[in-house]
A protein has these predicted regions:
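Charged, structured surface patches that assemble and position nucleic-acid processing machinery
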Residues: 118
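A short, conserved, highly charged catalytic patch centered on acidic carboxylates
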Residues: 1-113, 121-165
Length: 165
């Protein structure tokens, strides 16, 4: 089974990243992309990592009020000017997500629909409305304490049902 659909495998990957590599933000990128790419959402998306883009004429469309997000979600068409449906901003699991964070606010203003996650907590904003806020676990005394698998199932269901366009 896929890491993106199996909570035990997902937890193990987060824990390994946490223990072996201080779970730096970039450790989450492949996990986040897999969760989105393998969602059962009927709206097929192109998930593009723009986290290390430099400003250029080509990349300007991905540059918002808060700079580049980590990912942009585009229409799944093989065209350069595919419509942008939203973005994803990731933080390290050791960083608590702040709904008033300037970077998040800029991404919401620029891209409208934003998934905001540190791997343990997942939030989705549609404009200024927080549509879901699901906590898979938290760090307590330097160790990840996981919540019930039902939270994971709820997260997958919510992601599967996001209306991107």
């Amino acid at each position: 089974m896929s890491i993106a659909r199996n909570f035990d495998d997902f937890k193990e990957e987060i824990e390994l990243a946490f223990i072996q590599n201080a779970c730096v933000e970039i450790e989450l990128y492949s996990l986040i992309a897999s969760v989105i790419r393998e969602s059962k959402n009927k709206q097929k998306l192109s998930v593009r990592d723009v986290s290390s883009r430099k400003r250029s004429e080509i990349s300007a469309k991905y540059y918002g009020l808060s700079g580049f997000p980590d990912f942009v979600l585009l229409e799944r068409k093989k065209v350069q000017d595919a419509p942008i449906y939203g973005c994803i901003e990731a933080k390290m699991p050791t960083i608590a997500l702040n709904d008033k964070d300037e970077q998040l606010r800029g991404h919401i203003e620029s891209f409208k629909k934003v998934i905001y996650t540190n791997g343990l907590n997942w939030k989705f904003f549609n404009r200024n409305e927080k549509c879901f806020d699901i906590e898979l676990g938290s760090i307590i005394e330097g160790k990840i304490e996981w919540n019930e698998e039902s939270n994971w199932e709820e997260l997958l269901n919510e992601i599967d049902n996001i209306t991107w366009y």
